[in-house]
Regions:
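SAM/dcSAM-binding transferase cores
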Residues: 2-23, 37-43, 211-274
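The AdoMet/dcAdoMet-binding core of the Class I SAM-like
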Residues: 10-12, 43-167, 184-185
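S-adenosyl-L-methionine
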Residues: 31-33, 54
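A short, flexible beta-alpha/helix-coil linker loop
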Residues: 35-39, 147-150, 175
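Generic structural signal for well-ordered, non-membrane alpha-helical segments
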Residues: 49, 187, 245-248
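A generic structural signal for alpha->beta connector loops
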Residues: 92-94, 117-119, 172, 198-200, ...
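C-terminal substrate-binding/active-site "lid" region of AdoMet-derived donor-dependent transferases
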Residues: 159-229
Length: 274
């Protein structure tokens, strides 16, 4: 049930809690509970407010030009900010956003200017189940950006999940992973899982976040050898409003420092009734 809090702001119930859309001029921010989840500028669909999305955009833009076609699977939908931005900046791209919360997906489709399918298709379902059931080689990009109460569900972080992601990608496909780090969240586990499956793994992270000095986002990118130009990505990252740097594979290996990867059996996936 939707509950308006002002002429433009709106609050509503979801399958897993509550959500709020707050407007500031042309910009709308989606909150899930008290956590900012997505931000969209209705006057500029390419606008990306969150730094980690800018980092992912720099990687994708290094591989595909404005007129190039690619297919992207977004595991974690919310307001589909990244899918919408890429749909605008790369007009031939096609996107499937997987959102586990049906009511949230319905409200987002109603209140945000999300392009219709086939440009952006919203699929309701569990991200891992969708990965497990997707035909091999179906996507050029997979973005994992799924959170519940501020943490990524463990069944999306295991070696087996990464194996499914790699199988779902084309041979030169790219897996982009938004990892929380700090406090109880340990992005080293995510990176360790990626390193067991992909030949090339790098990351983009604030040094303070990497040291555990504050909670934040680590963007990991994984692919086959020779797919990405690390120097080109690094140059693009340094031009951002808040410049960033890429952590190269050898430095990332030291950062992980023997952290073990999670496995399905450890996290109880699949559950007995699945």
């Amino acid at each position: 049930m939707a509950r308006s809090s002002s002429s433009r702001d709106i609050s509503f119930d979801t399958d897993f809690g509550s959500a709020h859309i707050r407007w500031d001029g042309p910009r709308a921010t989606l909150f899930l509970g008290d956590v900012e989840s997505s931000a969209v500028d209705t006057s500029d669909p390419t606008y990306l407010e969150f730094e980690y999305m800018q980092h992912m955009d720099a990687v994708v833009s290094s591989l595909w030009g404005a007129q190039d076609r690619f297919r992207a699977l977004h595991v974690g939908g919310a307001a589909c900010a990244l899918a919408c931005a890429w749909s605008s900046s790369h007009s031939q791209s096609r996107h499937v956003a997987v959102e586990v919360d049906r009511l949230l997906a319905e409200q987002v489709r109603e209140h945000f200017p999300i392009p219709k399918a086939p440009q952006v298709k919203i699929r309701v379902g569990d991200g891992r189940a969708v990965l497990d059931g997707t035909r091999e080689g179906s996507f050029d990009v997979i973005v994992r950006d799924a959170f519940a109460s501020g943490v990524t569900p463990d069944h999306l972080r295991t070696v087996e999940c990464v194996q499914r992601a790699r199988a779902t990608l084309t041979a030169r496909g790219l897996y982009l992973v938004n990892c929380a780090h700090g406090g109880a969240a340990n992005a080293r586990q995510d990176v360790a899982a990626l390193r067991e499956v992909f030949p090339f793994v790098a990351s983009i992270q604030d040094p303070k976040v990497g040291r555990g000095g504050r909670r934040g986002n680590v963007v990991a990118l994984a692919c086959a050898d020779g797919v990405v130009d690390v120097d080109e990505i690094d140059r693009a990252l340094r031009t951002l409003a808040l410049p960033a740097r890429i952590t190269r594979p050898r430095d990332l290996e030291r950062w992980v420092a023997g952290t073990p990867a999670l496995r399905d059996a450890q996290v109880g996936y699949p559950q007995a009734d699945e």
